[in-house]
Amino acid sequence: MQGDVDYAGRYVFTGFATDRPLTYPSDVKAAEADYTITQSFDRESISEKKVYTNAYTNEDIINLNVKKDTDGKIVTPNVATVHRIQLGYSEVDADGTFKITDASGNVATVTKNDDGTANVTGIVNANGETIDSLDDGSGNPVSITFTTDSNYIPGDDEIAINSQLGEVLLGENVYNNTYTNNSFSVQYEKSNFKKGDVDPTMYFTCVDNVTGISYVKKSEDIEYNVNFTQKLKVNTQADESFDIYLGRNVDDIMAAVQNTIDIENQISKVESMKKEEKYAGTDDQKKLDDMLEGLNKQKNLAKDQMTKAFEKGIGQMQEYQEKISNAKADVGNRIQRLDLTKTRLTEQKTNFKSLKSQNEDIDLEEVVVNYTAAQLVYNAALSAASKVVQQTLLDFIG
């Protein structure tokens, strides 16, 4: 990875930690990492995620489970939109401790029970006082849940955590409160890093759960004195060039592609089942036809979402490319400033050398002769002047 480039054995993009690479170089090193990471978000961090309703699963196909509403009418898959906050990493520790700070400054500590439900404890407000629950900004209590369903739709007053995907889903009322107050943060744990994963200390405020060392994310500009009272920044940090969400955006595109492939495989499975003697009955054939109709609609929806994912990805990649270009332009600007300073110092050095040469490399005998001649002229001028001033006005009266 270009982020791990080094110069003279020192990593370029890691601030003062020049002895540490930006990413984990091996699975062995990655396995040693265990961090509690804190991420703060604003309204711009909230994205829309498309999920499928009434989607068919592999279990539905095997069990010939046709999707129906409460009135017994067949329903077909559709697309819904949920509000998502994407964490910096996927596959965060599901059995770890989460801390969610809502837009009002209330903090909830959340762990996962053995049955998959959420255990919410220690809820305090911004003043440190214990309260019953988070609220949606209108006084309504907010529930917190865990989910493994990639198509999960939270309730209006619900926050859903998907640790596998590294996502926090916001219900409509929670989203509105977060958007209005422009504040939300999540603290989570991650211990299953892999080779190539980014070291979280380079991007986030976090705590090393192995050593207990706390890392506070801040600017680490390395400056050199290049002239009198003039300093120049000589490094570029990773977050100034590489966006950690580039990989997450690629994951979204891959998920959209894989979803389309999975649905096509499901369609092939149903078509194959229609030809089997086991499902030759009229009732089974009807169910398979109904499922096939739903799956074909689901495939069309998936293809549409895949196209939109690629279109969105192109825009995101252009933004990341622009960020890198801006970083390169900044480095180029600093190089020009350094070259200008170097040119000025070179000129000053030449001038001082010339002055030094004029003073130190002169012919001493010639200087003495010139000095003596100048002294004689000076003394003669003084003598002539003294004779002139000896006469007064009275010498000319008479």
Predicted segments with their positions:
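Non-transmembrane, interaction-prone segments in cytosolic or luminal domains
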Residues: 50, 54, 58, 72, ...
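Polar, low-complexity export/assembly segments characteristic of proteins
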Residues: 2-18, 153-323, 327-330, 337, ...
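Amphipathic alpha-helical polymerization modules
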Residues: 1-2, 70-73, 290-398
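Generic serine detector
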Residues: 26, 40, 45-47, 90, ...
